[in-house]
Amino acid sequence: MAKGQSLQEPFLNALRKEKVPVSIYLVNGIKLQGQIESFDQFVILLRNNVNQMVYKHAISTVVPARNVRTAPPVPTETHAQSSEEFGNI
Protein backbone atom coordinates (compact mmCIF):
# COMPACT_ATOMS: atom_id res chain seq x y z
CA MET A 1 0.00 0.00 0.00
CA ALA A 2 1.39 3.40 -0.96
CA LYS A 3 1.98 5.95 1.79
CA GLY A 4 -0.73 8.29 0.41
CA GLN A 5 -3.27 5.48 0.49
CA SER A 6 -2.67 4.84 4.20
CA LEU A 7 -4.50 8.08 5.05
CA GLN A 8 -7.02 8.05 2.22
CA GLU A 9 -8.43 4.59 2.62
CA PRO A 10 -9.48 4.72 6.31
CA PHE A 11 -10.92 8.23 5.86
CA LEU A 12 -12.94 7.39 2.75
CA ASN A 13 -14.00 4.04 4.19
CA ALA A 14 -15.33 5.66 7.38
CA LEU A 15 -17.28 8.18 5.28
CA ARG A 16 -18.69 5.31 3.19
CA LYS A 17 -19.60 3.04 6.12
CA GLU A 18 -21.22 5.81 8.17
CA LYS A 19 -22.98 7.26 5.09
CA VAL A 20 -21.73 10.73 5.97
CA PRO A 21 -22.78 13.43 3.48
CA VAL A 22 -19.73 14.98 1.83
CA SER A 23 -18.89 17.97 -0.31
CA ILE A 24 -16.21 17.21 -2.88
CA TYR A 25 -14.46 20.20 -4.43
CA LEU A 26 -12.82 19.64 -7.78
CA VAL A 27 -9.64 21.36 -8.93
CA ASN A 28 -11.72 23.48 -11.34
CA GLY A 29 -13.82 24.82 -8.42
CA ILE A 30 -16.97 22.73 -8.95
CA LYS A 31 -18.62 21.48 -5.77
CA LEU A 32 -20.24 18.03 -5.76
CA GLN A 33 -22.35 16.76 -2.88
CA GLY A 34 -23.55 13.31 -1.90
CA GLN A 35 -22.50 10.15 -0.10
CA ILE A 36 -19.54 7.98 -0.96
CA GLU A 37 -20.91 4.75 -2.33
CA SER A 38 -17.56 3.16 -3.18
CA PHE A 39 -13.97 4.00 -4.10
CA ASP A 40 -10.80 2.49 -5.43
CA GLN A 41 -7.28 3.66 -6.20
CA PHE A 42 -8.42 6.03 -8.96
CA VAL A 43 -12.10 6.95 -8.53
CA ILE A 44 -14.81 7.73 -5.99
CA LEU A 45 -18.41 6.74 -6.70
CA LEU A 46 -20.58 9.56 -5.31
CA ARG A 47 -24.32 9.03 -4.83
CA ASN A 48 -26.92 11.78 -4.71
CA ASN A 49 -29.87 11.85 -7.11
CA VAL A 50 -27.63 10.01 -9.55
CA ASN A 51 -24.35 8.12 -9.24
CA GLN A 52 -21.26 10.03 -10.35
CA MET A 53 -17.83 8.54 -10.91
CA VAL A 54 -15.30 11.17 -9.87
CA TYR A 55 -11.64 10.69 -10.75
CA LYS A 56 -9.40 11.32 -7.74
CA HIS A 57 -6.90 13.33 -9.79
CA ALA A 58 -9.69 15.90 -10.33
CA ILE A 59 -10.42 16.26 -6.59
CA SER A 60 -9.03 19.11 -4.55
CA THR A 61 -10.80 18.61 -1.20
CA VAL A 62 -13.24 16.23 0.50
CA VAL A 63 -15.27 17.89 3.27
CA PRO A 64 -17.49 15.69 5.48
CA ALA A 65 -20.69 17.18 6.93
CA ARG A 66 -19.56 15.95 10.36
CA ASN A 67 -16.47 14.53 12.01
CA VAL A 68 -15.73 10.87 11.41
CA ARG A 69 -13.72 8.45 13.47
CA THR A 70 -10.95 6.72 11.55
CA ALA A 71 -8.41 4.13 12.59
CA PRO A 72 -5.65 5.52 14.82
CA PRO A 73 -2.66 6.72 12.80
CA VAL A 74 0.41 4.56 12.58
CA PRO A 75 3.20 6.19 14.65
CA THR A 76 5.97 7.65 12.55
CA GLU A 77 9.42 8.83 13.47
CA THR A 78 9.60 12.58 14.05
CA HIS A 79 12.43 14.81 12.93
CA ALA A 80 13.51 15.36 16.56
CA GLN A 81 13.76 11.62 17.17
CA SER A 82 15.91 11.02 14.12
CA SER A 83 18.15 14.01 14.98
CA GLU A 84 18.79 12.58 18.45
CA GLU A 85 19.73 9.23 16.98
CA PHE A 86 22.31 10.82 14.70
CA GLY A 87 23.81 13.20 17.26
CA ASN A 88 21.84 16.36 16.34
CA ILE A 89 23.21 16.73 12.84
Swiss-Prot record:
Residues 78-89 have a biased composition (Polar residues). This is RNA-binding protein Hfq. Residues 70-89 are annotated as: Disordered. RNA chaperone that binds small regulatory RNA (sRNAs) and mRNAs to facilitate mRNA translational regulation in response to envelope stress, environmental stress and changes in metabolite concentrations. Also binds with high specificity to tRNAs. PANTHER family: RNA-BINDING PROTEIN HFQ. One of its GO terms (molecular function) is RNA binding. The lineage of its organism: Bacteria, Pseudomonadati, Pseudomonadota, Gammaproteobacteria, Chromatiales. GO terms for biological process: regulation of DNA-templated transcription; regulation of RNA stability; regulation of translation, ncRNA-mediated. Belongs to the Hfq family. InterPro entries: Hfq (IPR005001), LSM_dom_sf (IPR010920), Sm (IPR047575). Keywords: RNA-binding, Stress response. It comes from Alkalilimnicola ehrlichii (strain ATCC BAA-1101 / DSM 17681 / MLHE-1).
